[in-house]
Amino acid sequence: MTAARAVLTAALVAASAGAQAQPADSSDVPPPLRSAVTAYRQGDTATAERALRSLSASSADADAWLGAVLIDRGARAEGLRLIQRAADAGSAEGEHRLALIYANGEAGIPRNDGRAAELFEKAADKGHRRAQLNLGTLYFRGQGVPRDLIQARAWLEKAAADGDPYALYALGRAMSESAPPATADPARAADLFRRAAEKGHMLAALRYGMMLGEGVGIRKDVAAAQHWLAMAQRNGIPEGALAIGDLLARTPASRDKAANAQMLKSAINWYEVAANAGVPSGQFKLANAYLAGSGVTRDPAQAQLWYGRAAQQGLPEAQQALGIMLLTGTAGVTDPVEAFKWLYLAERGGHPEARAVRDKVGDKVPDRDRKKAEALAQAFKPTYELPREETLPRLIPPPPKR
C-alpha cells in the first residue's frame, strides 16, 4: 500500500491537542483542575491562568497545566520553571509536558530525544494516556530509543484502551508494519483504522479506504473504499484523491469501450485534483496521462510542467521522465545540462534506469556540461508542496454510519 506522504511518521500528540477527542468536562484530569483545564482547552487562557494560580501551591499537576498556559501566553521562562517543578515533584502531567518540550526543542530547550523518551516513560508508567501514546510513537519511530515494534504496540495498546482516535490510529500504523520478531497484522490494522475513522480521524479514513480498495486485511469493497477516500480528500487529506484515481485506474476493463473511457477520464480527473493539491505521485501520473494522451488530449508541454513539479519535490520517477524529455526535446525544449541534472538526481533517488540513459547518450554531451549538471545535482534541495510527515489532523464530526 502506498504511503500517504513520501515519508510518514506518526505525530507526537500534545497534552492539549485533539480537544474534540478529550472529554468535554475534562474528566481525564483531577476534579479540582477540571474547570480550569476546560477553559484552557476552549482557548480561554486568561480564565485558566487565574484558576490555576490559585491551585498551583498545593498541586503539582496544577503547576504543569499553569506552565503550559503561561508558555502559550508568552511567559516562557516562568512556564518552563513550573513544568520542571511539576516533573520534579513526580507529576505525570509535568513529566509529559516536559517530555514534549524536549521532543520538540521548545521553550528555549534544545531537542533531546533520549531525555524525552525517559520522561514519557515516567508519565506512561503512571497511566498518563498521552504519554503512553507518545512513548509508543517514539518506539515506532526509533526516536530517542531503539526502534521496537513490540514495545510500540504494548504502549499504544494501553493508550488506545479508552478508544482515543489518535491512539487507535497510531496502533493501526504499528500493526501495519513488520520488523522481526513482530509481524504485521493487516486485519487488526484495518479494524483500528476503521474505529479511528468513525471517530473523525481523516488519516485513518485514508488508510482504511486504501485497505478496502486493495482488499488488504479486509474484504475488498470498492464502493466503501471510495466513500472513505472521498471523505478524507474533502477534509484536508489530498492523498485521498490520488488513491481514488488509483482505484479507478485499476478497475478491470469491460466490453463497454465508452464506459472504459469514462472510467479512465474519471481517474485522470482525480489525479488532477491530487496534483493541484501538491501530491507528487498525482503530479507524476497526471504528467504520464498528458504525455501519452491517455484520458486527456496529448500535451507534452503540460506533461513536462507536471513532471517538473513532481521532480522538484524529489520524486525519482518524475526526475527520470523530465530528464528524458529535456534530452529528447519532446516538448520542444532541449537542455542537456538540466536533463543530466535530473538524471543524476533520479539515480541518486534509486531509479534503476537513470544511469543507463546517461550512459547511452553520454558521448553526445560535452564533459563540461556533464560536470555542470553533476554540480547542480549536488546543490539541489527539494521543495515540498506538502508536509513530509504526517501532522496531527483535526478531527471532524463522526461520519454517518453506512
What is each of the regions a protein language model found here?
Residues 7-15:
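Bacterial N-terminal signal peptides
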Residues 43-47, 73-82, 109-119, 146-155, ...:
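Structural signature of tandem alpha-helical TPR/SEL1-like repeats
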Residues 12, 19-68, 72-74, 386-402:
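N-terminal leader/linker segments that initiate helical-solenoid repeat arrays
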Residues 63-72, 97-104, 109, 134-141, ...:
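Hydrophobic face of amphipathic alpha-helices that form TPR/SEL1-like repeat modules
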Residues 222-317:
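Eukaryotic tandem repeat interaction scaffolds
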Residues 27-28, 57-60, 89-91, 105-106, ...:
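Short helix-capping/linker turns of helical repeat alpha-solenoids
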Residues 52-55, 85-86, 122-123, 158-159, ...:
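Canonical positions in the second alpha-helix
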Residues 353-402:
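Terminal, low-structured helical/coil segments at or just beyond the last alpha-helical repeat
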